[in-house]
């Protein structure tokens, strides 16, 4: 059981966004002997284990046993989880701080996100050869870049009485100290009123776009879009005097993803009859 816990925590630590969940899961299957199929190809399949990656967002894996007509068993799990998602054109300034405009995604428990160092992970879409051939890059800061802080208790005496948080005001993560607007003007990415969709001047891009460009190692003008989520950077752990419990972010729903993966990998190892 200890081995399974360690593998689960390693998996959760790597799956910091839905895109990373698909990528990590795909690599697990390939390392276990699965063959990747392309949706554009015509398939003539014998007994074996196969996986299909659909645009980096969805994964289908199946094992064809010795007697495919024997049984058919299906299991599924969603690769997303409660998180804080970064909105388009997210930079906002307030009282000397630069914050991110975000949305609360899924059934997150708001107060558990306070005072936690937050990293960012997801995918960034870049200009390709033409409008029909764009590139996408996985991004994971692997370090804290933001935080949603609590006020000190002497500034909020009712904090222990059960305070309802205003998501639009009190749940905006702090990204950095505000820079001089004259030295660092911020404008929305892909402003429709701008005659140039990709202006050459670096000052046309907000701090978030510049940050993503640094992470991807590209020019800000190459960024078309992104889907980024914030995540707690602390690692999961086994706890309790007998190691009976697990504490980790993203248990909902990565435990299900890991369980489904473990099942289909085991089906390949035992070469069970039917289709899994």
Question: Each predicted region: which residue ranges?
Answer:
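N-terminal hydrophobic/helix-forming segments and targeting peptides
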Residues: 1-276
